[in-house]
Amino acid sequence: ATDNDPAARFKAQWAHRHWTQFLATSQKATIAMVNGYCFGGAFCSLAACDIVITADDATFGLSEVNWGILPGGNVSKVFADLVNHRNAMFYAMTGRTFDGAKAVEMGIATLAVPADDLRDEVVSIARELMEKAPMVLAYTKQAMRNVGDMDMNMAYEYLATKGMALRAADPKDTRGRGMSEFL
């Protein structure tokens, strides 16, 4: 619909990029629920979420090669970050599809469940997350998003500093209460 309208295409690309950045940087936990199809640009939204639950029979793929185009708009980068190099090359170059179970095996999704159970599973996980301290979840999300690109020493320093910042910012002393309940 935007092929012959560069302004509309730019607007759509900007909106998609803004949305994926919002998902990735949100202080709240985000859950993607995949039921049906996940192709091309949908991988960007999916990768921006913290948890991905898919129907085991959902269909995933990078079909761009079949249409004579590149998986652009950061789709190639996102897909290459999600899966190992061999899988990235295979699926990007063949345009083949794969199911939800394979998406879990490749690290794209967290969990695959029967389609009839998908909504209930996502709601159950959302409720579980709602029982956690929001500030702790936000700090955990930030930490997990950042430490992957750090070496061990840098990660240690970052996490120690992040932990101190959390303790200072947490008016409910979630750590203290959690430790006393654990012990």
Predicted regions: what they are:
Residues 15-19, 74-78, 87, 139, ...:
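Hydrophobic alpha-helical segments typical of transmembrane helices
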Residues 1-19, 38, 66-68, 151:
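Glycine- (often His-adjacent) and acidic-residue-rich active-site loop
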Residues 12, 83-84, 149, 175:
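Short linear sequence motifs
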Residues 1, 95-100, 120, 124-127, ...:
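C-terminal alpha-helix plus adjacent terminal tail
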Residues 8-9, 60-61, 80-83, 88-91, ...:
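Short, surface-exposed, polar/charged, turn-prone segments marking secondary-structure boundaries
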Residues 21-134:
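Crotonase-fold acyl-CoA enzyme core
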